[in-house]
Amino acid sequence: MIDRYKHQQLRIGSVSPQQISAWANKILPNGEMVGEVTKPYTFHYKTNKPEKDGLFCERISGPIKSGICACGNYRVIGDEKEDPKFCEQCGVEFVDSRIRRYQMGYIKLACPVTHVWYFKRLPSYIANLLDKPLKELESLVYCDFSFARPIVKKPTFLRLRGSFEYEIQSRKYSIPLFFTTQGFDTFRNREISTGASAIREQLADPDLRIITDHSLVEWKELGEEGSAGNEWEDRKIGRRKDFLVRRMELAKHFIRTNVEPERMVLCLLPVLPPELRPIIQIDGGKPMSSDINELYRRVIYRNNTLTDPLTTSRSTPGESVMCQEKLVQEAVDTLLDNGIRGQPMRNGHNKVYKSFSDVIEGKEGRFRETLLGKRVDYSGRSVIVVGPSLSLHRCGLPREIAIELFQTFVIRGLIRQHIASNIGIAKNKIREKEPIVWEILQEVMQGHPILLNRAPTLHRLGIQAFQPILAEGRAICLHPLVRKGFNADFDGDQMAVHVPLSLEAQAEARLLMFSHMNLLSPAIGDPISIPTQDMLIGLYVLTIGNRRGICANRYNPWNRRNYQNKTVYEYNNNYRYTKEKEPYFCSSYDALGAYRQKRINLDSPLWLRWRLDQRVIAPREVPIEVQYESLGTYHEIYGHYLLVRSVKKESLCIYIRTTVGHISFYREIEEAIQGFCRAYS
């Protein structure tokens, strides 16, 4: 359906019999109303045309060929001057044949039937609402159990039958004949109730607000009683309280949605449009029918068998009527959910029939196969690999996938820049992979986000937006921090790529779905982008440094002997480096350059010149050593920093004791903070 905001959506729920008949009924020009399927037939074996009032009737579902009725007459579709719109002979409407994809019919059931989804699925909504055991309700639905109605000031059928059976044993065999007359239904319907009609009566009687109030009162009373001291009794009370909560929620749902509970019992059974349950011919002209058709035929056969004794004047034993009602209930159960009551129904080849539940549920069902997970244009799929050099909001897209997804945009760019005169020439340039194609592709990708999805999509973070960049190879490169949101691993997992086309979709992707804007879990609010174990190990190795303290060379005899054979190196006139002595650097660039030239190790301690910052200097710390120079300046050496002072004891500069790993880590954090400030300034 389409709401007032023009959003297409699908709503599933229970409907009234009036709504079902309104979907199917049509009034012919002669005043006849069609829409009810009364015959279990499909196509005539001689003419190969749909049977009238059958499962494929053209009067009910529309013509097989657009504008052509069952008689072969033709009318122009949509021409208001053409009159009439229905064929006077066969009653088929002159419309497009696509109407057979959505025009429904219905079967008028001779007796009410409980909907097995509401009755047998756990938790059973009918059992919860009526507060009765499921086994007792099953006996009632399948006519194994009956209950008496309260009748006042009337001779009861039950009392009369009991007196005949127990007081006058000689007339025991003649009494069933009396009760099999046509008046049996009148007596029985007044005195006793069984089958789905009994369930329907019980669902229609109670007030939902009273059910909610009584359940709340009982729940409070059980809560006030406290523990009984017996573990079994405590569990029993806990289960009862949980049941009362479910019952109140169910009643409130019916009140909120304005749905009558008796709709869980069917009086009219909808019939799917013919195109959704087709009959096709395979090789050799052999017809192959959908399993739904066979299950519909079974329902119609049993329903007609029950309708005949109820509408004709011939006598039928009451037990036979109840047995036939049970067969109708079982046939509808098989149609809706085959096998829910035990052994599923099979065909002649010992193959289980596919019911409604089998058609719509599961990975190959109607929803996941054709509505939610169907193949769409502007999408691709590939394996994901880690891209540690990527930003959090970027992903690497293989060239092969990128050129296919953005091909229409690239073609438009080639034509706009007069590189190609038409679409054919543009496609040839793309096929030949000319350099200008990749340049235009990069321009297109800069302003167009993409969506990455990993199945199953269990929560909002299963689909996130990224800014694509071209990557070599055939795998999608992904930042490791976004892995947790997708619940993915880099061990062969695959992801789907989608391109949002409309401006609304692109704006939603940029404002709501970008990965760097989804850092917290929507469920509990905890950070979702946290370092993994391998990242923590890498950071540990990067920042562990050399465990030797500043006094290691001074007080270690072995190091003191090696210190006598030191060698001094000059590098860019900015620092002095010795094999044993810790080197001095004026900037982090010099330190990283020495590391790249393999003059120092990643964990080698060094002295790095730093800006004067009082937060680095400890006010009461005593220097380990003071070194004086010839010009009067001196160095105060502390545990983690070195302070250079002038003759007047003024601080000239400061060196901090660090490693190349610490420098690299600090620079990455500093660049990230600066980029964040620029983005939000």
From Swiss-Prot:
- Would I find Nucleotidyltransferase among this entry's keywords? yes
Q: Which SMART domains match?
A: RPOLA_N
What EC number(s) is this enzyme filed under? Answer: 2.7.7.6
Could you give a GO molecular-function term held by this entry? magnesium ion binding
Q: Which InterPro entries match?
A: DNA-dir_RpoC_beta_prime (IPR045867), RNA_pol_asu (IPR000722), RNA_pol_N (IPR006592), RNA_pol_Rpb1_1 (IPR007080), RNA_pol_Rpb1_3_sf (IPR042102), RNA_pol_Rpb1_clamp_domain (IPR044893), RNApol_RpoC1 (IPR034678)
GO BP term, example: DNA-templated transcription
- Which residues are noted in the entry as Mg(2+)-binding? 489, 491, 493
Which cellular component appears as one GO term in the record?
chloroplast
Instruction: Please list the reactions this protein catalyses.
Output: RNA(n) + a ribonucleoside 5'-triphosphate = RNA(n+1) + diphosphate
Give the record's cofactor note, including how many are bound: Binds 1 Mg(2+) ion per subunit.
Instruction: Name what cofactor the protein needs.
Output: Mg(2+); Zn(2+)
Keyword annotations from UniProtKB, A to Z: Chloroplast, DNA-directed RNA polymerase, Magnesium, Metal-binding, Nucleotidyltransferase, Plastid, Transcription, Transferase, Zinc
Function description: DNA-dependent RNA polymerase catalyzes the transcription of DNA into RNA using the four ribonucleoside triphosphates as substrates.
* Subunit (UniProt): In plastids the minimal PEP RNA polymerase catalytic core is composed of four subunits: alpha, beta, beta', and beta''. When a (nuclear-encoded) sigma factor is associated with the core the holoenzyme is formed, which can initiate transcription.
Query: What family, per the record?
Result: Belongs to the RNA polymerase beta' chain family. RpoC1 subfamily.
According to UniProt, the name of this protein is DNA-directed RNA polymerase subunit beta'
Question: What is the organism of origin for this protein?
Answer: Drimys granadensis
The upper taxonomy is: Eukaryota, Viridiplantae, Streptophyta, Embryophyta, Tracheophyta
